[in-house]
Swiss-Prot record:
GO biological process: L-proline biosynthetic process
Catalytic activity: L-glutamate 5-semialdehyde + phosphate + NADP(+) = L-glutamyl 5-phosphate + NADPH + H(+)
Gene source species: Clostridium botulinum (strain Eklund 17B / Type B)
Any one annotated GO CC term: cytoplasm
Protein name stated in the entry: Gamma-glutamyl phosphate reductase
PROSITE patterns membership: PROA
Keyword Oxidoreductase: yes
Gene: proA
InterPro entries for this protein: Ald_DH/histidinol_DH, Ald_DH_C, Ald_DH_N, Aldehyde_DH_dom, G-glutamylP_reductase_CS, Glu-5-SA_DH, GPR_dom
GO MF term (any one): NADP binding
This protein's pathway: Amino-acid biosynthesis; L-proline biosynthesis; L-glutamate 5-semialdehyde from L-glutamate: step 2/2
Length: 414
């Protein structure tokens, strides 16, 4: 606990410097962080190899190994991500709106940093770099607690990034990593209200639920993605197949991957054999309801548990629905509020789906894989918020700020 309190104190001190840092000072730090990342790439890759070897010994799935894996190209992408942040507008100090009251007071609403952000995440070392860069650009100090699976990678990345921050003249404690990966330390971090202003968990359902349940620090819930694609009776089959294959197989272990497929009963007999064959060619295990099993052989029966499960693997659950209303009802019951899609050429059905599905991102005729800060034009993101308070959807720089009111007067009293 002493180590945590020390990190909290240092982060709080750093946050007071960062909140007043100029855009050029922050951008200089980001550039130097990217440079140090590449200068240390051989060391980082060697440390990442240790994590990969440990993960393989534990029987980690291929999809999860892909999340953990770093090579020169991925490190270059991470450094490029830091440089892209340099080109994004600095939200700090922006006056969102201003108005004048009848008594002459001028009242404005201005963006300011959150302060100290805590991030608890799993085996994705790229998150270490993304989080550090985003928090710094938005004027926040950050305390990271990554998973044990990526501890060697994270230590190496943070060491390099901190060298860049220190060289720029900003406080080196703007970025800190908790190297103790025990659950007890994570629980203590969740209750560090005196120092941490907001906590953001990134990972699977178990991690996020544990943080939401145990934290006394305010939490922005992110990431669990039980995403659906509904194929309407008026869908273009070729478009539907392309979208489903992309959404399921391009990167199955990410939160915006498709997990469930809903098919209108009027097209099921024609469409299901085609799409299941295409999925199997990509080595996807298909689980279906009893209606699906009657149409296609060798489909594993889906259980009630399947409908609410995020697989993060080459597995998909398929259900036949009577109509769009049943599809929407199913999605709102079992979905995680992340990303949902409809494939249809019917305008009325597309609008009904957009209006009635309760999710952060709702698509018409496009893959759920686009729910991403860069794809939305925000630059990198800290995560995908699935809650409704403060932020919803991809969380870019603006979502890492809060606001304060600034009031100009000329002697008014009340």
């Amino acid at each position: 606990m002493k180590e945590l309190i020390l990190k909290g104190e240092r982060a709080k001190e750093a946050s007071y410097v960062l909140m007043n840092a100029t855009t050029s000072e922050k951008n200089d730090a980001l550039i130097k962080m990217g440079q140090k990342l590449l200068e240390n790439k051989e060391y980082i890759i060697a440390e990442n190899k240790k994590d990969l070897e440990n993960a393989m010994l534990k029987g980690t799935s291929k999809a999860m190994l892909d999340r953990l894996y770093l090579d020169e190209k991925r490190l270059e992408d991470m450094a490029d991500g830091l440089n892209q942040l340099v080109n994004l507008n600095d939200p700090i100090g922006e006056v969102i709106t201003m108005w004048k009251r009848p008594n002459g007071l001028q009242i404005g609403k201005q963006r300011v940093p959150m302060g100290v952000i805590g991030i608890i995440y799993e085996a994705r070392p790229n998150v270490t770099c993304d989080a550090a860069g985003l928090c710094l650009k938005a004027g926040n100090a950050v305390i990271l607690r990554g998973g044990s699976e990526a501890i060697n990678s994270n230590k190496a990345i943070v060491k390099a990034l901190c060298e860049g921050i220190k060289e720029s003249g900003l406080p080196e404690y703007s970025l800190q990593l908790i190297e103790n990966t025990s659950r007890e330390i994570a629980n203590e971090m969740m209750r560090l209200n005196e120092y941490i202003d907001v906590l953001i968990p990134r990972g699977g359902a178990g991690l996020i639920q544990a943080v939401v349940k145990n934290a006394t620090v305010p939490v922005i819930e992110t990431g669990v993605g039980n995403c659906h694609v509904y194929v309407d009776e008026e869908a273009d089959f070729k478009m539907a197949e392309d979208i489903i294959i992309n959404a399921k197989t391009s990167r199955p272990a990410v939160c915006n991957a498709e997990e469930k497929l809903l098919v209108n009963e009027k097209i099921a007999e024609e469409f299901l054999p085609k799409i299941i064959s295409a999925l199997r060619e990509k080595n996807v295990e298909v689980r279906g309801d009893s209606s699906v099993m009657k149409i296609v052989d060798d489909v594993k029966e889906a259980t009630d548990e399947d409908w609410g499960k995020e697989y993060l693997d080459f597995i998909i659950g398929i259900k036949i629905v009577n109509n769009i209303d049943e599809a929407i009802k199913h999605i709102n019951k079992y979905g995680s509020g992340h990303s949902e899609a409809i494939i249809t050429n019917n305008y009325q059905n597309s609008q009904k789906f957009l209006q009635r599905v309760d999710a952060a991102a709702v698509y018409v005729n496009a893959s759920t894989r686009f729910t991403d800060g860069c794809e939305f034009g925000f630059g990198a993101e800290i995560g995908i918020s699935t809650q409704k308070l403060h932020a919803r959807g991809p969380m870019g720089l603006n979502e890492l700020t809060t606001t304060k009111y600034i009031i100009y007067g000329n002697g008014q009293i009340r």
